[in-house]
Swiss-Prot record:
Lineage top rank: taxon: Eukaryota
SUPFAM superfamilies from the UniProt entry: SNF-like (SSF161070)
Source organism (scientific name): Caenorhabditis elegans
Stretches of the chain found on the membrane's Extracellular side: 173-257
A GO term, aspect molecular function: L-amino acid transmembrane transporter activity
Keyword set includes 4Fe-4S: no
Membrane topology classification: Multi-pass membrane protein
Cytoplasmic topological domain residue ranges: 1-74, 605-714
InterPro entries: Na/ntran_symport (IPR000175), SNS_sf (IPR037272)
GO cellular component: a single term: postsynaptic membrane
Spans through the membrane: 75-95, 100-120, 152-172, 258-278, 287-307, 336-356, 368-388, 422-442, 476-496, 502-522, 548-568, 584-604
Protein name: Sodium-dependent acetylcholine transporter
């Protein structure tokens, strides 16, 4: 039917005559009623002014903001994912499990456990321009996952802040002619402080044997004494960490005193985070140039220096010599799966947040592979750095590599690597560089963890809080300063161990499984991949592989990781100290708290949904009407009739359009299978090479709808 009039005055307020039937193919399949009660445009709403010309200059989304450029965005993702785990966990696993052979299960699990979740969170965050809570408009019943992620991000914020404070404490004390932990002549050294075997034997004017013993000749009696030096006491870096930095108490129930110097470091780190986030992604996007690029430069300098030390090359060759028999050990595969899952910081909400500030049509496929490759490279370079230090330490203590044992976590960074750097010439310089690198790496991660919390809160309540973002940031930082104070007590290390072993481990895997089921089974894997196509313009390569991976392999992998974590769990201890039962029970309760929010919020969403019981289930299992691109110009690329201004352009009053499904969405029977229908549409889209509901394709085939151009303005 031809269009005889385009006069907007002849139409009603929503651009359509009453009584007309509308082709529902121009609506998203989850819109449940004709007009969807779309609100008019406001500056604090979720939809930007429609059809605004996009030139690539300035913010695309002027309400929420965007990254200033692509490099800001990429460095932010790299800074968030390539964290301190590349220096204190991955090298330990490689050393314990067959050297380079461990890379085989690690890379396999990286593709099966990390890549799918990384892809999914980046796509949904960029597609909806929403942070961790608001993104769950996609499946309102599972909105509690967003609250759980924000809660876990709060734990991460405190955790990384304490690590930053410890690092800052070390950094400040590195600015001296002789770093404190290089010798035992200190008040905190204690009785069992032991220097390196070669140094100690040299001080006694002895001769070092191959087995690590020292022969000392006594001039007065012409006798010799053999001393097994490497069996003595503790190295000074461990004494320094326990007695000076932490003022460590006897146990978790012995709170001790507050370390005021450490408390000031905590305050300084939180002030730094506040200043970096004060202007949102505009300021944090500039900080990452220092927080991400400088650590790479320092890492190169440190690696070059350590490779020149005695014994370092032997350890590197030890690393490069694979022990293939470990591939038959299921425990090694379990460790690789756990490390691969945590290596890209999935399921804490940070990836949703970072991706939400990128431009809508940013090519996310290339970004995902680039970030994963950089993450692997950083982990490998971290391994080389650690193995070089191991070789040098074994040389100093006259211990063979096969008999050398290290601990992961805090000990690897603050004890072992600190001890290795203390033996290098010009030690204060290299120790200072090392702790600057660790401080910047941890700060970059903490910065975006806090940004996740702030953005999630502001996105969930935009009318009240988006204009007052700085007030939200101030409140969040002040709250976390108070929560960080208990970790500055003498028992702080024990609580950090509990936090590491319980709160920041298995709850993330539970969230990953629920998130995977909600997106790939409830929302539909086809719809998620269609969102990716909407962003980039083409389907991800190997579409069938991705579909099988998301829908079937990922849930099984996450369940396997969860079972491994629970079955492999042993009674937690720190050195010889056994944690009491009540502290472990407390840690379990804290770890379970974020997960309890998921059913609570789900029940709340069901209760506030309107309609009968069946209609309530319909509303909480299907995407909210507001789900989709944040800007109207992007929504209008496929569903122009969802935008009031577009309806005034596209629908003259006399046009008679029939529903494509024969019934309106509000009259749709509750037995209608949304996922099946949309999946069929998606498969049709793939076969034709374009979206079935793309406005340009509709305009070309339907004479009743005028051609819509992206640059059209009202």
């Amino acid at each position: 039917m031809s269009v005889s009039s385009n006069d907007p005055e002849q139409r009603n307020g929503r651009g359509m005559a009453s009584g007309n039937n509308v082709d529902m193919s121009l609506y998203p399949p989850f819109i449940k009623q004709l007009d969807a009660k779309l609100p008019d445009y406001t500056r604090e709403g979720d939809i930007e002014y429609p059809f605004e010309e996009i030139t690539g200059v300035g913010d695309e989304n002027r309400i929420r903001g965007n990254w200033s450029n692509k490099s800001d965005y990429l460095l932010a993702v790299i800074g968030f994912t390539a964290g301190v785990g590349s220096f204190w966990k991955f090298p330990f696993l490689v050393f314990q499990h067959g050297g380079a052979a461990f890379l085989v299960p690690y890379l396999c699990m990286l593709c099966l456990a990390s890549l799918p979740m990384f892809f999914m969170e980046m796509v949904l965050g960029q597609f909806s321009s929403s942070a961790a809570i608001s993104v769950w408009k996609v499946v309102p019943l599972f909105k509690g996952i967003g609250f759980a992620q924000v809660t876990i991000s709060g734990f991460f914020a405190v955790f990384f802040n304490i690590i930053s404070a410890w690092t800052l404490f070390y950094l400040i004390n590195s600015f001296s002619f002789s770093i404190p932990w290089s010798n035992c002549a200190n008040s905190w050294s204690g009785e069992n402080c032991t220097l390196g075997t070669r140094i100690q034997c040299k001080e006694m004017n002895g001769t070092l044997l191959v087995n690590g013993s020292c022969i000392v000749e006594h001039a007065s009696s012409n006798e010799t004494t053999v001393i097994p030096l490497h069996d003595l006491g503790s190295i000074p870096s461990l004494k320094y960490f326990h007695n000076d930095v932490l003022m460590l108490s006897k146990g978790v129930d012995d709170f001790g005193t507050l370390n005021w110097y450490l408390g000031l470091c905590v305050l300084a780190c939180w002030i730094a985070v506040f200043l970096c986030l004060f202007q949102g992604v505009k300021s944090s996007g500039k900080v990452v140039y220092v927080a991400v690029i400088v650590p790479f430069i320092i890492l190169t300098v440190l690696l070059t220096r350590l490779l020149t030390l005695d014994g370092s090359l032997a350890a590197v060759f030890y690393f490069l010599t694979p022990k293939w028999e470990i591939l038959m050990d299921l425990h090694v595969w379990g460790e690789a799966a756990v490390q691969a899952f945590y290596s890209v910081s999935c399921c804490s909400g940070g990836l949703f947040t970072i991706a939400s500030y990128s431009r809508f049509h940013n090519n996310i496929y290339k970004d995902i592979w680039l970030v994963l490759i950089v993450d692997v490279i950083v982990s490998l370079v971290g391994c080389l750095l650690t193995f070089s230090a191991i070789g040098f330490t074994c040389y100093e203590f006259a211990i063979s590599l096969d008999k050398f044992h290290i601990r992961d976590g805090f000990h690897l960074v603050f004890v072992f690597l600190a001890e290795a750097l203390a033996g290098v010439s010009v030690a204060p310089l290299y120790a200072g560089l090392f702790f600057i690198m660790i401080l910047l790496v941890v700060h970059a991660t903490q910065m975006f963890v806090v940004e996740t919390i702030v953005s999630s809160i502001c996105d969930e309540y935009p009318e009240r809080l988006r204009r007052n973002r700085r007030h939200v940031l101030t409140t969040v930082c002040a709250l976390f300063i108070l929560l960080s104070i208990p970790f500055c007590l003498s028992s702080g290390l024990f609580w950090m161990e509990l936090l590491t072993q319980f709160v920041l481990t298995w709850p993330l895997v539970v969230i990953a499984f629920l998130e995977c089921m909600a997106i790939n089974w409830v929302y539909g894997v086809d719809n998620m991949l269609d969102n990716a196509k909407w962003i980039v313009g083409y389907w991800p390569p190997c579409y069938i592989f991705w579909k099988i991976l998301f829908k079937f392999i990922c849930p099984m992998v996450y369940l396997a990781i969860l079972c491994f974590l629970w079955l492999d769990w042993n009674s937690i201890q720190y050195e010889s100290y056994q944690f009491p039962y009540w502290s472990i029970l407390t840690a379990w309760c804290i770890a379970s708290f974020p997960l309890i929010l998921i059913p609570i919020v789900g029940i709340w969403q069901f209760c506030i949904a309107k309609g009968t019981i069946t209609q309530k289930w319909w509303r909480v299992l299907y995407p909210d009407d507001a789900w989709g691109p944040a800007m109207a110009i992007h929504r209008a690329e496929k569903f122009p009739l969802q935008i009031p201004e577009a309806r005034r352009l596209l629908l003259p009053p006399e046009v008679e359009i029939a529903s494509s499904r024969g019934v309106l969405q509000e009259e749709m029977p509750m037995s209608y299978d949304y996922n099946t229908s949309s999946a069929a549409d998606v498969r049709s889209n793939r076969s034709t090479g374009h979206g079935a509901t793309d406005v340009r394709s509709v305009a070309a085939t339907n004479n009743t709808i005028p051609k819509f151009e992206r640059e059209t303005a009202i």
